[in-house]
Amino acid sequence: MGTPFYCYSTATLARHYQVFAESFPEAKICFAVKANGNLAVLKTLAALGCGADVVSEGEIRLAIAAGISPSNIIFSGVGKTADEMRYALSQQIFQFNVESEAELLALNEV
């Protein structure tokens, strides 16, 4: 077996997510895709109702491929390009964490 090798437990991931979700029943939990973009991990979280916090078009594509609803995707991060904002909007992602007034104006232009 080559390295690196990653072994994930779906049962453990689901259990930890559910304990966290039960601790904060009013919160919408969004996993930071930058923390782990493994499609199997994202699919497991999506099946549990988890949303996604993304910072790039690539992460948007991963979240959608995993089955996370665009209505549960938040586009965060600094330096979003106009093309990335346009792509997010074309995918029906309407939750943006805007990092500056300039970014807000750029989003308004898109």
Show the residue positions of the predicted features.
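A charged N-terminal "starter" segment
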Residues: M1-V110
